């Protein structure tokens, strides 16, 4: 019997090949798209969730009270405090980049990414040791000049033939400190934030922080820090206790301490991620909507096919078939199509995995992805069977009880609303994606045409390494296509503020007012050479520099932008004084502030991505190391100059050192809009897929519907109806469905688009024509899809139709 069901199922698959093809391909696309999105979300939110204590492990970060800036980590002395003074804490671990230039057996190792950790690190994040000391991979030593080191398999195989050969090797840094490899551990998984080449242990307890006052150590730069709480700890109470710990105990009056689950660390503290978590969630929800669109299409086509087979079911019933037999046949046919859709989905994944990894900047384990696809397929199969069987159960009941009237009665009373609802849902999802894609396109186009406020053309950004700074600035002058080297200091184009301060003072500043002010510390001629427009006063000049200034600042003249001038609330800010505290140069509270004279006001310019409003900004001279250099090139010589700069950096960078990151400013701007561009591609693709699935589905349904209604149309023509009236009647039906779908989907799309646009200070305004354009586009799309079928049916010969029946 089962064999007969399968044979009949494949026969019907071929008989209704167009509908079957649309069902299988559409379902395969929906299943694959949603599965990839779900896998991506699960992968990105499971970082380091595989460690035994991950459920109770939290990352510690701090917020500077002065600047409001979030900093990953905390002063290292907090780790000792947590281990000794907080009973809620099971383990507290800290780690930090070690730096260093290493050699081993006269072999240059270069600057691997080593991190020093405290003794709790391997308890909290136990590594998989593959060679060496299994029980204590990095024993702590009292002598800081001689430490033990555990390295990854990748690092060991880079310099030695086997992990075992690396054991016992001694690495010596530039200070003649040595590190002995005592263990080789397995490479960290790709979904882990711990990606160092090696780790060595140091002691971190309060006895190591007694030579100076606690306040001194609490002003140290932050280190990475993680805490594992006991199982029954009240996390909220612990968080409140930790939040103001340093302030209440007068250890650091400018430091708030916060915690976040380790699985959220990557996105909560990673401001420069290619994709934020909201985008990934949007991807998943969009994939789910596409899946529902394909499921609605599948259900519509399946139910329509079953009604087309009403005579077959009536004949089966008359020959003794019972409900069970009919249900089994339908279940087998749906199962065959879902299985074929899964096979197509597997093929799509195999073909597109490299492209998906590159596009989404992620790593894909195919075996896990295939399991997710199978689970999604089972979910879809269950949902399809439940809905289809529920819909047709009454139809089969009618066939059993009313041999003559059953099929036609059910068709006229139930099939129509099923068809209309299903088509409407598909069109609604399609309309939502089309509207969103339109808004995204307009917003991105506006962003690309927004002036940054400085000349971004023919400009190269270099994140310069300190090892090559002097030689680079000397030799860059010899490249003929480069006309100028601009000291950028801390200025860089990014999503996040790189340096902001709140404790900036000026005359008549409102009491208790707090403003986050961006500080640009760069070369004396930075604003002039970046071609930032001067509105009042003058630029900074060489004569403003004071080489003998005791604070080390070197210049007490500054420029401000329009936003900062508005805060000063004065008609002429030129000559006004502002004050600021600089804890790096002037110490802690109680030290007199630094005073600066405003000599010029420049036009507002974007130093951050266009997701951010232009902040009040102060430009001051920076007398220290430049993190960024900007190279101005001859017009049209940008690519040639970029190639020459990269060759220079490659030539002068010592062996083993990372190369300085170099790119054009316009390329950097493209990176900053990567999420927006990816969102546009996503919703455009979804709109196209939904439109195609809907078009094929509507075409198939309309073809079947016209075939079923040919007798009705013939009778109407005999009774005097013209072909034009029949065409208008049929098109009116589909137009009403389309209007209803737009009436529901467009307000939902508006709410989503408006919420998305709120993150941009300069955004497009949603106008009436945007709604009208989508409405007209969908009406035109539907009419063109069904018009051919309707015209053929309306122009048919009614006499032949009546005779054939």
Language model features with spans:
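Small-residue-rich transmembrane alpha-helices
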Residues: 32, 36, 258, 334-402, ...
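Intracellular coupling helices
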Residues: 6-14, 18, 22, 26, ...
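Membrane-helix entry/capping segments
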Residues: 3-6, 11, 15, 19, ...
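In a subset of proteins, long, contiguous C-terminal domains/tails are tracked
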Residues: 616, 627-630, 641-654, 659-662, ...
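Membrane-proximal extracellular/periplasmic loop immediately following the first transmembrane helix
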Residues: 37-101, 115, 144, 214-230, ...
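Mid-to-C-terminal secondary-structure elements
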Residues: 118-135, 149-275, 474, 478-672
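Hydrophobic alpha-helical transmembrane segments of multi-pass inner-membrane transport and secretion
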Residues: 15-42, 276-311, 339, 418-443, ...
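Generic structural signal for small/hydrophobic residues in well-ordered secondary structure
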Residues: 13, 23, 44, 60, ...
């Amino acid at each position: 019997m089962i064999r007969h069901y399968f044979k009949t199922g494949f026969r019907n698959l071929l008989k209704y090949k167009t509908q079957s093809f649309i069902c299988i391909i559409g379902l395969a696309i929906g299943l694959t798209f949603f599965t990839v999105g779900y896998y991506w979300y699960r992968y990105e939110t499971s970082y380091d969730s595989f460690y035994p204590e991950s459920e109770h492990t939290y990352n510690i970060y701090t917020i500077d009270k002065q600047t409001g800036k979030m900093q990953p980590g905390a002063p290292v002395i907090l780790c000792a405090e947590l281990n000794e003074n907080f009973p809620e804490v099971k383990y507290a671990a800290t780690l930090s980049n070690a730096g260093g230039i290493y050699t081993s057996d006269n072999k240059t190792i270069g600057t691997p990414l080593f991190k020093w950790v405290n003794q709790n690190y391997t308890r909290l994040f136990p590594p998989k040791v593959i060679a060496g000391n299994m029980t204590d991979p990095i024993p702590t030593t009292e002598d800081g000049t001689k430490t033990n080191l555990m390295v990854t398999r990748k690092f060991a195989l880079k310099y030695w033939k086997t992990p075992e050969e690396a054991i016992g090797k001694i690495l010596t840094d530039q200070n003649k400190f040595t590190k002995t490899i005592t263990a080789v551990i397995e490479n960290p998984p790709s979904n882990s934030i711990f990606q160092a080449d090696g780790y060595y242990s140091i002691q971190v307890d309060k006895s190591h922080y007694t030579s100076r006052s606690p306040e001194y150590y609490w002003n140290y730069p932050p280190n990475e820090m993680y805490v594992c709480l006991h199982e029954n700890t009240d996390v909220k109470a612990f968080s409140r206790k930790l939040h103001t710990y340093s302030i209440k105990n007068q250890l650091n009056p400018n430091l708030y301490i916060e915690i976040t689950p380790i699985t959220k660390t990557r996105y909560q503290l990673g401001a420069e991620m290619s994709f934020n978590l909201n985008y990934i969630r949007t991807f998943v929800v969009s994939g789910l909507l596409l899946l529902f669109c394909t499921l609605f299409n599948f259900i519509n086509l399946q139910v329509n096919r079953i009604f087309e087979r009403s005579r077959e079911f009536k004949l089966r019933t008359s020959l003794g078939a019972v409900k069970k037999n009919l249900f089994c046949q339908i279940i087998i046919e749906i199962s065959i199509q879902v299985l074929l859709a899964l096979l197509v989905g597997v093929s799509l994944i195999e073909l597109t995995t490299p492209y998906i990894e590159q596009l989404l900047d992620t790593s894909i384990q195919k075996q896990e992805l295939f399991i997710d696809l199978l689970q999604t397929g089972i979910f879809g199969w269950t949902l399809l069977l439940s809905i289809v069987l529920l819909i047709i159960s009454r139809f089969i009941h009618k066939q059993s009880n009313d041999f003559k009237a059953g099929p036609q009665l059910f068709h006229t009373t139930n099939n129509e609303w099923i068809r209309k609802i299903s088509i409407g849902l598909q069109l609604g999802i399609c309309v939502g994606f089309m509207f969103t894609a339109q808004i995204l396109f307009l917003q991105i186009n506006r962003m690309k045409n927004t002036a940054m406020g400085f000349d971004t053309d023919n400009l190269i950004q270099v994140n310069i390494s300190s090892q090559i700074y002097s030689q680079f600035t000397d030799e860059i002058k010899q490249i003929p296509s480069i006309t100028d080297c601009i000291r950028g200091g801390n200025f860089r184009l990014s999503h996040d503020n790189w340096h902001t301060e709140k404790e900036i003072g000026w005359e008549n500043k409102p009491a208790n007012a707090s403003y986050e002010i961006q500080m640009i510390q760069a070369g004396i001629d930075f604003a002039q050479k970046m071609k930032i427009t001067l509105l009042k006063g003058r630029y900074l000049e060489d004569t403003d520099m004071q080489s003998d200034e005791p604070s080390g600042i070197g210049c007490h003249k500054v420029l401000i932008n329009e936003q900062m001038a508005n805060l000063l609330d004065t008609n002429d800010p030129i000559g006004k004084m502002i004050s600021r505290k600089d804890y790096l140069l002037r110490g802690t509270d109680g030290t007199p502030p630094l005073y600066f004279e405003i000599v010029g006001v420049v036009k507002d310019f974007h130093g951050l991505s266009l997701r951010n409003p232009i902040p009040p900004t102060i430009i001051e001279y920076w007398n220290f190391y430049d993190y960024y250099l900007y190279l101005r090139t001859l017009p049209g010589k940008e690519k040639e100059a970029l190639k020459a700069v990269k060759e220079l950096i490659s030539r002068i960078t010592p062996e083993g050192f990372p190369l300085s990151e170099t790119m054009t400013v316009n390329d950097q701007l493209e990176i900053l809009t990567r999420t927006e561009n990816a969102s546009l591609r996503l919703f455009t693709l979804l709109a196209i897929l939904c439109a195609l699935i809907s078009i094929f589905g509507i075409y198939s349904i309309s073809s079947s519907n016209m075939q079923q209604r040919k007798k009705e149309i013939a009778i109407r023509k005999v009774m005097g109806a013209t072909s034009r009236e029949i065409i208008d009647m049929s098109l009116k039906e589909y137009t009403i469905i389309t209007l209803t779908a737009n009436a529901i989907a467009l307000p939902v799309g508006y709410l989503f688009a408006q919420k998305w646009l709120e993150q941009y200070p300069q955004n497009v305004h949603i106008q009436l024509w945007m709604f009208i354009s989508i409405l007209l586009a969908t009406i035109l799309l539907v009419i063109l899809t069904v018009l051919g079928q309707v015209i053929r049916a309306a122009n048919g010969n009614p006499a032949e139709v009546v005779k054939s029946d």
